[in-house]
Amino acid sequence: MAERKQLQPNFIPVSLADFVISSLCNSRPTVDSTNAMAYELLDVTTSQWHDEVIRDLSLDKLSWPSICSQGEIVGQLQFGDRMVPCYTAVGDYQCALAGALLDESELSLNISTGSQVSRITEQIQSGQYQTRPFFDGKFANTISHLPAGRSLNVLVDLVTEIPRSLGMPEFDAWEYLAKAAEQADRSGLRVNLGFFPGPRGNQGAISEIRERNLSVGTLFRGAFENMAENYSECAGLIWPDRSWKSIVFSGGLARKLKTLRTIIQEQFSTPYRLCALEEDTLLGLMALALAFSKRTASVEEAMKALRTHYADRLRTISNT
């Protein structure tokens, strides 16, 4: 739009969530640094807009929203005779990491439709990964868009095509596939889940097929092994000395497939734990609410309090 001279001066580029808050509170739109990252115009080193890049893109005539401090009240919503304080929207990725109750000695594996490998650091550490602002002035290093549920569904659709085309009764294919993968031995079958563009390429494959090593079980075991290899390689990029104490699994697929967790654990030779709750993002919002309402001094302190509260659900599972 800028190249075509279609941008009107002083327009405010704003996320949907921040627009809603601004409209409800009748206040000027603002943005949190964790959300500003999505604009791809944030200087992560200063948590301010990257003015030089904005000028180079001819976007300097726009009125950019102020980047607020963590937990800053940006408006008041009238609810009956009460005024409810409202805060800037935060990044869902960072909120989910907070809800995983991740500490700096743990490696996060979020596995759902797509997947991410992440860690939290005190300082910026550049490398072959994304660095995003986190809470309390910290940073999150991550490699995202790794093959997971979306790629596995390609294989699920393949092995269920015949019963579906014959109109046979629906069944829980995942339950059968997980059990078959668990019972399958290592067969040498190789699966590359890179069916879609991403950090691990965009040309998937099934290879090393022999007369007796191709079955539903070996196919999905090979797929899970490929995921584990991807995570291990990416973990080495964001954490070169591999000094993490344990893995934290979050996301629907990681919770659902114990066989996948076991194969990943074998690849890493590292203990693991699950996120305390299925809804990790909502738990992250609880941590933020504790910090923003001054019930705790920081988001980190709120996460520690929740770790204590949910201690019985954070049991670490060691290698067997």
PLM region spans:
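Active-site core segments that coordinate phosphate-bearing ligands/cofactors
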Residues: 2-16, 21-29, 40-43, 47-48, ...
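Nucleotide/phosphate-binding loop and acidic/charged catalytic motifs
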Residues: 30-36
